[in-house]
Amino acid sequence: MASSQSSSSSIRPQAGLNEGDHQSLPQLDTLISYLLGAKRSLSSITHVWRANEIVTASHSALEKSVVLCSRTGFLRRGLNGQLRLLYDVRSEVEQISYRGRDEFSIALKNLDAADARLKHTLDLLRGTIVHASFRPGDEEQKSLHDFVDERGVEELHASLKASIDRTNTARAELDTSNHEFDDELQAIKKSLRHYHTATKLASSRLSITSSSSSASDSGLLTLSSMPGQIQSLEAHAQEMATLLEALVRHFDLCVTAVKHTDGGGAVARSITGDMPAGVDGSNDGMPNIGAEINANLNAPLDPMTDAEYQEMVAVLIKDAPEADDVVMEIQDRINEMESIFEQVQAQRDALLSISKATIEVHSHLSSLASSRLPRYISQAHNFTRVWLEENDRINSGLVELSDLHSLYDGFLNAYDSLMLEVARRRHVRQRVEKVLRDTRHKLDQLHDEDAAARETFRAEQGDFLPSDIWPGVGLAPMQVQFTRLSGGQLDGGPIGQKPLEEPSGGEYAGAAKAGVSDGSAEGEQIPDLPRHLVEEAYARVKARNKVASQLHTV
């Protein structure tokens, strides 16, 4: 719109114009309609005030968004490292749990196997009855188990049970700790899902993009469109202010034209007495338009020539149709600003949501790292310490179980070998007795032959020989007596003796012909075992030797 012209200080009379000029100039009613339209157009000042508020609020939103981006980016970079460390710790704790559980399971299987072997051997000892010939006749029947003291086994079982219980307790505490750790991780994952949801929402609906691929990978957001949007808002606001100034100039020109028209002064004062709301307001961004309008209304009219008046009216005629277009443009611009401002606010709110989600994760991690994480790590270390201690005890107990099994299994094998030894000794005794019987028979023959020869000599020559020529000439043949000597102890202990025969001269013949008795009461007592027991013992010893040979070969 063209700028207004200065007016004369008094109403210019109509006689100053000729009839042609009077017909070409608009009537007062037309000028009043222009003034009313200009007055209505000043209502657009509320849009200008709103534009100024939007620009101010957008600057505040930008400042807050920059702070949020910076803080969120800083926290997010720290979170990435903390999360990696946290999952590394959880993985290590889980490895400790799995490793300990596997080792403990293997140890229990080995213990169960060793204990089963020991119990089987003890059952065999209970089921193996000592043959009565090994024991005194008045003694109650006994099994091999009666010769075993199981207190050592019971004490070993109690020790192993204590180690297993302590390990189970430590493992249960570790499992509980790990479950709590997992709950913490689930809570953190939930917080991270909130973060990712907020990020996706911002990325899909707003102009928030990642500054680079690495930034995208780390989830750090940066503002790309907000500064441009605010520049657009500022441009709209500036243009709206310019348009409003044009409307004000148009209004002032209408007031001046009406006042310079005959009879228009009172009408102008009447119309301008009730200005649209907001015209009298002011702030740092906008001047007090109401004061300027009032100053123009109350200012005295400057003298104006006919040419100046005609020029002013021509400007009004030209500008009046454009006033509505200016108002529409201001309306369009404020609508555009509201739309942009909604995007700015939404972007700020999205960043605020991301920031809150990040702070939530950070707070959770900080609380976890400062209070609960050390306890989870300590619990894993405690389990490792307990398991190392008890594993040594369990391994020692496993060795003791194996030793006891070997001892009792050796006892079983030794008893079988004892029966074989008894059979061997009895066979040797039988061979000895046979030698004795054969020798006795030969000695008896020699004795009889010698006695007969002596008797023949005595009968033939005895009458001729004096009795004192040889005292032994009339003696009977000597007798040979076998004496059984106890073998004593194999380690060289004292040896007892028990003669089998002490015959007198008159008993010799009978004793000599009686042979040698193999009674068990004489010399060494050898149990008389049934043949089937010896054969069964031999089969078992042979089977054990075969297994031992195979193991040695492997």
UniProtKB/Swiss-Prot annotation:
Entry keyword Transmembrane helix: no
Coiled coil residues, start to end: 327-353
One Pfam entry name: ATG17_like
GO terms of biological process kind: autophagosome assembly; autophagy of mitochondrion; piecemeal microautophagy of the nucleus
Main location: cytoplasm
Compositional bias ranges of the Low complexity kind: 1-10
Residue segments, region Disordered: 1-22, 490-529
Keywords: Autophagy, Coiled coil, Cytoplasm, Membrane
GO terms, molecular function: molecular adaptor activity; protein kinase activator activity
Record membrane topology: Peripheral membrane protein
Localisation: Cytoplasm; Preautophagosomal structure membrane
InterPro entries reported for this sequence: Atg17, ATG17-like_dom
Function recorded in the entry: Autophagy-specific protein that functions in response to autophagy-inducing signals as a scaffold to recruit other ATG proteins to organize pre-autophagosomal structure (PAS) formation. Modulates the timing and magnitude of the autophagy response, such as the size of the sequestering vesicles. Plays particularly a role in pexophagy and nucleophagy.
Protein name in UniProt: Autophagy-related protein 17
